[in-house]
Amino acid sequence: MKDEAGERDREVSSLNSKLLSLQLDIKNLHDVCKRQRKTLQDNQLCMEEAMNSSHDKKQAQALAFEESEVEFGSSKQCHLRQLQQLKKKLLVLQQELEFHTEELQTSYYSLRQYQSILEKQTSDLVLLHHHCKLKEDEVILYEEEMGNHNENTGEKLHLAQEQLALAGDKIASLERSLNLYRDKYQSSLSNIELLECQVKMLQGELGGIMGQEPENKGDHSKVRIYTSPCMIQEHQETQKRLSEVWQKVSQQDDLIQELRNKLACSNALVLEREKALIKLQADFASCTATHRYPPSSSEECEDIKKILKHLQEQKDSQCLHVEEYQNLVKDLRVELEAVSEQKRNIMKDMMKLELDLHGLREETSAHIERKDKDITILQCRLQELQLEFTETQKLTLKKDKFLQEKDEMLQELEKKLTQVQNSLLKKEKELEKQQCMATELEMTVKEAKQDKSKEAECKALQAEVQKLKNSLEEAKQQERLAAQQAAQCKEEAALAGCHLEDTQRKLQKGLLLDKQKADTIQELQRELQMLQKESSMAEKEQTSNRKRVEELSLELSEALRKLENSDKEKRQLQKTVAEQDMKMNDMLDRIKHQHREQGSIKCKLEEDLQEATKLLEDKREQLKKSKEHEKLMEGELEALRQEFKKKDKTLKENSRKLEEENENLRAELQCCSTQLESSLNKYNTSQQVIQDLNKEIALQKESLMSLQAQLDKALQKEKHYLQTTITKEAYDALSRKSAACQDDLTQALEKLNHVTSETKSLQQSLTQTQEKKAQLEEEIIAYEERMKKLNTELRKLRGFHQESELEVHAFDKKLEEMSCQVLQWQKQHQNDLKMLAAKEEQLREFQEEMAALKENLLEDDKEPCCLPQWSVPKDTCRLYRGNDQIMTNLEQWAKQQKVANEKLGNQLREQVKYIAKLSGEKDHLHSVMVHLQQENKKLKKEIEEKKMKAENTRLCTKALGPSRTESTQREKVCGTLGWKGLPQDMGQRMDLTKYIGMPHCPGSSYC
């Protein structure tokens, strides 16, 4: 915001400066208008005075005319002349008035335009001022909000630290109370390990986050360090370029001054030469006037010859001077071109500097935007962290309440445990008393058995014994219930301890997270302060850079003005040089006209002959070059054909290799599919084994139920035998059998536990195999997709190969056509050579004729000029016509040869382009083949990895096989055990009912 305000202040200052400059321009225009009005008023006064004077003069002249018409006739004519001059002056003044009025109107319109522009700019300035004030108010409000926000965050941090200290004290007290329970509850170790793994994961994530934050810090510092030296270097470079531009401008000014001096000297020389020419022309005219008639004597002829020689010498010297002037003009033109090139280079440098300035401005704006974005991101991060901190505080409060509730529950459970233990002790004492009573009663029963006379008392005692047994059974049932309740209470206590430890760990984690968040908040606040400082430093640098940029822009504008002035001066100089060139050319045309008339015929003939010989030599060289080029092209074509053949072979080999690799991949896929099928079969067999195990478990349950029924029957029989008073020997046998049954039951229960553990392990292995199966199916799908892609790419490659083969065939056809064309061109070339030989013979004949004609001309020159003058021009005309025909024929033939050679060159260029195209397509095909080979290698590696994984899974399944066989063997042993003696076993059935009623099997799912 501050940067925008500064930029707008600078724009306002620039607009104010522009306004002041416009006001000064308007004042200057007003002054000019006032001056022009004053001049117009002065002109009008002069006109009025002249009119008044002329009117007075007319009146005086009329009076004088009336008085003396004869004396002042001549004065009348003078007055009329003066009147005409005055009228002319009036017309001129009127034209000047009209011109000045037009200028005033244009200046008035321009003033109006400037006023409208000023009004627009003033309105824009007012809007900008208003916008700047609004932005300043927004910045002040934003700073106040940031200050309040920082104060609130500081207060919240202090409160959070106090709350954290209180929570730490509470946690210390809880840790002291929980250290007592750690020795009792070791079953929570597995949960602790899982939670430790989660803590490690979270610590890793926190470490990653903390690592990202210093990296971001380092990036900010790097950007800050990088931007300032880059800006300084760029400003230094711009200053250096400006100094170079000023040096070039000063050099151009010096060159322009030197050129002006040279032009002044050349103008002076030209004026002198013109004067000398005028004098010579006058002398020549006087000579021709004096010497019209033929000379009468030999002396006069000699004098005339001397004068002519002198004139020729003067003419030669003038020609030399003219050539020197031409050379000077050429040098001036070269210097002007160099100056123009320097100016263009300077303009290019200026444009580059302007582009660099624009780039610097864009970079500064982008850097400011980046910093603003970083500040906004950090502010959002601060807000998010504050919200997370408040949420963690709420969670800690909830956890504290939950811990208090858990403590209360634990205290209540401990009280209940103590009560249950007391009741159990009481019941144990009662059981001991009842056992003592039972032993006493048994003793009495034995005594009663010995005494047959006391049967009635025995019956009564037996009834009492049954009652006592019933009471014992009830007491044992109560004990079982109490034991179950105690076990439940212990389990609840263990769960409560686990929950307490979990809550403790969560609290510790929350405290660590709170500390980390507080540290991150402090670090972010420090970063904010650092960023604010950096932004202030960057703003200062930007202000200094903008000032420098403004200074540089002013210097650029001054340099551009100077360049425009130099352009104007250059144009003026070019105009003057062009005028002088025109004058010099006119002079040269006048001087060299006679020479051209005399030596044009000879020069033309000699030049034509030389050109014809040169053309013939050039054609021969071109023919030799074309032959060599044709040979080279044929060699290149043969090399290209060989390369195409080799590449076709390589493409075919690569396609074969790709097909072989695809076949290998398909075979590997089939192997994978067979492995999958085998794993599925194993999975089905394992499921069948599990079903068999479940059936066997159900059978064992049924056998247990039957055992329970047999035990009930045995109990009933025991009661019956007790009623009928069976002998002691039968009772002992039944007790032995019951002990054996009890041992068998314990073994069966152990086997059941073992079977259940094995079933669990089998279920786990089943889940693992299912997961592996899903992974293998996904991999198979991915392989199928890869195969599809490879097949599509192979098809594309085959299509490319077919296209390349078709192109090669087409290229071969074109080569054949080109070879045919080359043969035709060779034939044409031979025909052309024959034509050239014939034309060379004609040229020789023409040269011989020309030599003979020259000899005849020399002889005619030697002979006296007594022949009539009309015969010579006829011979020369015939010679000219013959030479013109020869030259036209030669030119036509040369043009035809040029056209044919151009066609050949174009065709050869097209062939070279087509060859380059084919080589590019060849490179593309080669890159595609390399890419496909790399993909095939990757697929092979992946298939090998999958094979290794499949072998590992096979080894695992093989390792699981013997365990399953052992479990089945154990089940068979359990099934073949002798369960037949159970209904005959009697004795200690009360202990068996304990195991049957509540088989305490840890880890069994069928309890």
From Swiss-Prot:
Subcellular location: Cell projection, Cilium, Flagellum
Span of the signal peptide: none
Coiled coil: 76-103, 157-203, 322-717, 759-793, 829-863, 922-956
PANTHER family, A to Z: POLYAMINE-MODULATED FACTOR 1-BINDING PROTEIN 1, POLYAMINE-MODULATED FACTOR 1-BINDING PROTEIN 1-RELATED
Disease: Spermatogenic failure 31: An autosomal recessive infertility disorder caused by spermatogenesis defects that result in oligozoospermia with a high proportion of acephalic sperm.
Main location: other
InterPro entries attached to this UniProt entry: PMF1-bd (IPR037391)
Keyword Transmembrane annotated: no
Record key words, sorted: Cell projection, Cilium, Coiled coil, Disease variant, Flagellum
Any single GO CC term annotated in Swiss-Prot or TrEMBL for this entry: sperm head-tail coupling apparatus
A biological process from GO: spermatogenesis
Role this protein plays: Required for normal spermatogenesis. It functions as a scaffold protein that attaches the sperm head-tail connecting piece to the nuclear envelope, thus maintaining sperm head and tail integrity. May also be involved in the general organization of cellular cytoskeleton.
Protein name per Swiss-Prot or TrEMBL: Polyamine-modulated factor 1-binding protein 1
Superkingdom in the source lineage: Eukaryota
